Amino acid sequence: MSILRSPYQCLKQCGNYLVAARGSSIDTFDIKNGSYLSTWKSPVPESMSRSKTTEEETQTKNEDQNSETATPEFILESSAPPAKRRKLSITKESGENTGVVQQSKKKTKNSSPKILEPSPITALTITRDLQHVIAVTGEDKTIRVLAWEDTVEKGLRQISDRTMPKRPCALAITDDCNTIISADKFGDVYSLPLIPSPLVPSATENASVQKQAPKMFQPSASALTVHSARNLKALEAQKKQSNKVSEKTGPDFEHKLLLGHVSMLTDILVATLSGRQYILTADRDEHIRISRGIPQAHIIENFCLGHIEYVSRLCIPPTRPEILISGGGDDDLYTWNWLNGSLLSKTNLKSQVEALDTEKQSAQEAESKKIAVTGVYHARDEVSNQDIIIATSEGVPAAFIYFLTASNQLTHTQTLALPGNALSCTFSNPDLSSPFSLIISINNIHEPSSITTLKDANSSVANPLQFFKYENEKFVSVQQDGFAPQDSEGILDDQQKNNLCGLLYNVGNLRKMEDEE
């Protein structure tokens, strides 16, 4: 049985290098010959370690307090007069049993401590100058900026990490490569510098913090109205707890709120048209919003309205900057003139998915499969001057190839069947002397067309990266040597295999239930 590693959930081409994220690690390869270069590993967040330690200490203290209390009392309200203390009779036998149970609970909890693991990578992007890789580790809500090492191995090193107020779900980089634009699932879009600078709070900010200092808490009860020793202790603890000064929990780095949606954001793009910059955002409420670029991002230029279900992916072909292609939970791919907000065409994607599944599934199963677009990608064939659009859907072992015609229609030309569900796509550098290549990462852990059923342990395991070269206006599968990590990270056990669903398949969860509509 071969060793199984976590599949690659994100792929990006960075010049002559392939940047591939699997779990909480990023592998880098030479895209020309497939040679392995290095692996960057996400660190275990310190905040998670501290919170876990504090939680365990608190739990231990509570257990100790509960075990010490053998004669429970009724805690009196401060306004009530003293009442008789009623002691509950506890037999010797029952007391011994209780102690045994409590001791066994402690042993059980202490015998299986939770192991802290680094947060998986949920988003990945590259700056236009190819100098930096920006990754989002979702569990700790951190944006990490990585730079290339000036060594032969061309490894990545982290130069900054910034924890956002909410979990980022999509990233974009401005054309000057100086600003990161981050969208989170609570509908907010922030800008922050690519390379952070020390942020010194101003005197005005310090004054405002002093003005917001909380007043001292004065409980209505006092030592004159509380008589029992236990209630006096509770009163003192209440005073100490209530008089604690609340600490500032906001980010301590330079950042700015640009705009906000009232719904969960799903994707973001930065576009430039006629010398003016725009920010395009998509959300769960079927909206595509066109806003002006920084510093006027609060001004809404237009909306692209027409989707019935959520919008999950946006794509603007660099060769056709006025055109937007969007997809999500609808059966169709939409083509827009995004600045005018006008819908140019719709192309059915579900029919292609159903045609693929006909051989493997019954008609009822194929009909019940809903579209959840996970990727819309663009490539340019310089030989035929064709704009190529590639679309993938969640839980579908295929990639669907379209031509974007001069009349702004998407024409289906090919379906690439894959040995596993498609996860991410990227291209090698197009070279006029040789055809460019398409690289697709697949899920080789689950059965094709399924997001829950694991493959049999004795079944053959496909390569997590599939390669295709473009010849005569068609993609042809090719065998590519290399592209194999050499570290020991990412090897999966049975429990980790079951936990992959949440990382690899999260677009379909955006679909609203009947009671949400």
Swiss-Prot record:
Keywords: Nucleus, Repeat, tRNA processing, WD repeat. WD repeats lie at residues 116-158, 260-301, 306-346. It comes from the Eukaryota. GO terms for biological process: tRNA (guanine-N7)-methylation; tRNA modification. One of its GO terms (cellular component) is nucleus. It is found in: Nucleus. Residues 40-117 are annotated as: Disordered. Gene3D superfamilies: YVTN repeat-like/Quinoprotein amine dehydrogenase. InterPro entries: Trm82, WD40/YVTN_repeat-like_dom_sf, WD40_repeat_dom_sf. The keyword Nucleus applies. Forms a heterodimer with the catalytic subunit trm8. Required for the formation of N(7)-methylguanine at position 46 (m7G46) in tRNA. In the complex, it is required to stabilize and induce conformational changes of the catalytic subunit. Belongs to the WD repeat TRM82 family. This is tRNA (guanine-N(7)-)-methyltransferase non-catalytic subunit trm82.
